[in-house]
From Swiss-Prot:
The reaction(s) this protein catalyses: GTP + 4 H2O = 2,5-diamino-6-hydroxy-4-(5-phosphoribosylamino)-pyrimidine + formate + 2 phosphate + 3 H(+)
Keyword Metal-binding found: yes
Protein name, entry field: GTP cyclohydrolase-2
Protein family: Belongs to the GTP cyclohydrolase II family.
Molecular function per GO: GTP binding; GTP cyclohydrolase II activity; zinc ion binding
Active site: D127 (proton acceptor), R129 (nucleophile)
Involved pathway(s): Cofactor biosynthesis; riboflavin biosynthesis; 5-amino-6-(D-ribitylamino)uracil from GTP: step 1/4
Residues in the signal sequence: none
Biological source species: Neisseria meningitidis serogroup B (strain ATCC BAA-335 / MC58)
Positions that bind Zn(2+): C55, C66, C68
HAMAP family cross-referenced by the UniProt entry: RibA
Function: Catalyzes the conversion of GTP to 2,5-diamino-6-ribosylamino-4(3H)-pyrimidinone 5'-phosphate (DARP), formate and pyrophosphate.
Length: 197
């Protein structure tokens, strides 16, 4: 495969939204990532895709501090509706700072800091994720052209820089509530996320 990731195994994964094929990938350092796929990608047509970074609090514990869980659910539903697509699930918790540091950052947010201020106060990067990992997964699956479910322009640019043709950006505005309103505004104001179209 690529030097970034190796494909390890695949299996059938029935979910609330339909059946996916789950592919497991591993980095040389042992970090694991998965991709959920539906359909065949051999025709070369653009593939509906979501690059989703792990969020234990939002994806599994249903936290209302973020929009991650609703975004993952909406992406899974969209891929099943399309009948063809991929969700790349990168194990980069807390924008790459890890779960314990995310809990520390959440504590500072509880004291009034926003998500960016909290990371910086802890001496951590604002965003330490590496979206190039997705390109390795696309390469393994033969995907060269995508329709990307995202509000994050950095994901688009990273894929383009890696030679992936992003033919369309599909906004993913779901999950806003009173608890995460400031967080979403900070993503727009300080991280450049496209939140208003």
């Amino acid at each position: 495969m690529s030097e970034m990731l190796n494909h390890v195994a695949s299996c059938r994964l029935p979910t609330e939204w339909g059946v996916f094929t789950m592919h497991g990938f591993e980095e040389a350092n042992g970090q694991e990532h998965v991709a959920l796929t539906v359909g065949n990608f051999s025709d070369g047509n653009p593939v509906l895709t979501r690059i989703h970074s792990e969020c234990l609090t939002g994806d599994a514990l249903f936290s209302r501090k973020c929009d991650c869980g609703p975004q993952l659910e909406a992406a899974m539903r969209a891929v099943q509706t399309e009948g063809r697509g991929i969700i790349v699930y990168l194990r980069q918790e807390g924008r790459g700072i890890g779960l314990i540091n995310k809990i520390r950052a959440y504590h500072l947010q509880d004291q009034g800091m926003d998500t960016v201020e909290a990371n910086l106060a802890l001496g951590l990067p604002v965003d330490a994720r590496d979206f190039r990992l997705a390109q390795s997964i696309y390469e393994y699956l033969g995907i060269r052209s995508v329709k990307l479910l995202t509000n994050n322009p950095e994901k688009i640019q990273t894929l383009k820089d890696a030679g992936i043709n992003v033919v369309e950006r599909i906004p993913l505005h779901v999950g806003e509530n009173l608890e995460n309103k400031r967080y979403l505004q900070t993503k727009a104001d300080k991280l450049g996320h496209l939140m208003s179209e």
